[in-house]
Amino acid sequence: MFVDRLQLLNFRNYEELLIDFSPGKILIYGANGQGKTNLIEAIYYLVIGKSFRGKDNSLIRFGAESFQIGAKISKNGQKTTLGVEYSVKGKFFLKNGQKQKSFSSILGNLKGVLFTPDEPVIFFGFPANRRKALDLFLAQTSKTYLLNLIYYQKVLTNKNALLKQVWNVDNLIEAWNYKLAEFGAEIIKEREKCLKILNDIINELNAQLRFLPGKIEASYKTSGADDKEKIFELLKQKYTEEKDKKQALFGPHRDDLNFYVNGRDLKIFGSQGQKKGALLLFKLSQAVYMAKVSGEKPVVLLDDLYSEFDKEKREALEGFFLKYSDQVFITATEPIDLKNYHQVVFIENGKVS
């Protein structure tokens, strides 16, 4: 799959933009602050249904009242149009010109993998950031996972509301706990199953790219189990603690994902370079997983890759990503090695040429 055409209206510093893209490796270059990352952001918005770096109201171009993003996606010879329109009155998504009830109905129509310079700091920060990264990836590849996640979040919201009540809600909590256990067990199973596959891919890739010295393990740390009856019993045991804290404290919404190299936790002992390398391997493994398991190659978006790695590492990474993606976007401040790209786009003040 690849982005055939992108159209923007009042998005960030783009007043109006219409650009066609080719498959393959695309260089987007220009000075800092001209709109390179904004272009990447717009494409990835249609992958995850929101910005990866700001709230919707901050994306509207100064002086405008709304923004629009539209894209034509080519996949196996078929064309699909996706879009989003946002104003202070609300937001809605479109597929082939038809309004959708929610973003979940179009999630997966454009699969994508993103890497930005800020991601290692964010990813290795709070556990919620790592859960979010894993959930966004799995939701793209499995409709069942997405539905279980949606149902789990709805039940969790109801349970948290009950835990804040002053009257006796024990019977109601038990009913919600059983539903949490049911959906939670499926979420945990899918996360563990996926990470087992990703671990093999990560180590195969590292053997060739040599980013990190030794065996790498992405380890899933769960507060429960992957069996709904066991989770239900755990939730019953922890009810008093949850009632005291007035929030749900156990389940996949509190689980974590840690990276180890030769048994050492990268979050604690890893250098910034090692964290960057581990996260890139994780991202690359996602592209491989999508291509092999789901049968659809994602669009890859690499923001400011040139400032992060030397030429040898860059070329190796680009080659691997291109092997498992039909389209790779790379942003840079300088037009380096132009002959190596299928398309080159220059950006200045929100204008492309």
Curated annotation (Swiss-Prot):
Pfam family, one: SMC_N
Main location (coarse class): cytoplasm
InterPro entries membership: DNA-binding_RecF (IPR001238), P-loop_NTPase (IPR027417), RecF/RecN/SMC_N (IPR003395), RecF_2 (IPR042174)
Residues annotated for ATP binding in this entry: G30, A31, N32, G33, Q34, G35, K36, T37
Cellular component terms (Gene Ontology): cytoplasm
Protein origin, superkingdom: Bacteria
Gene Ontology MF, one: single-stranded DNA binding
Subcellular location as annotated: Cytoplasm
Keywords: ATP-binding, Cytoplasm, DNA damage, DNA repair, DNA replication, DNA-binding, Nucleotide-binding, SOS response
GO biological process: DNA replication; DNA synthesis involved in DNA repair; double-strand break repair; SOS response
Family: Belongs to the RecF family.
Protein task: The RecF protein is involved in DNA metabolism; it is required for DNA replication and normal SOS inducibility. RecF binds preferentially to single-stranded, linear DNA. It also seems to bind ATP.
Protein name: DNA replication and repair protein RecF
Lineage: Bacteria, Bacillati, Bacillota, Clostridia, Thermoanaerobacterales
